[in-house]
């Protein structure tokens, strides 16, 4: 299942209620990105590398050392697949991020979420320092995915 299809399913109730708007669906085919927004946050989704197989459900212990080393290395910033961008007034959470065009961009973050295949990593920025909140591996069950992601999307 492709990422925007999954997200539309996860957010279908909110979409139906008009709380969320899906932007740039054509960009999915051209650039591999879909933008979803509401009044509180902007979600930029890198779509092409996120495919899920819902054939099994398995949660494993995280590999934090690998995650931290990748996040600390700015040259590996392409590992960031899914970012939750808070309002610009949250300047105490300012950090530097390489966006999908490769340009250095300063954005205020609350949560950083990394979705790679069936792996979910959620960071919270505290004074420009990313703190691991949750990591789940081999999450291929839709209900488990919803349970993990939904609290961070409200």
Question: Which residues make up each language-model segment?
Answer:
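DNA polymerase processivity clamps
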Residues: 1-154
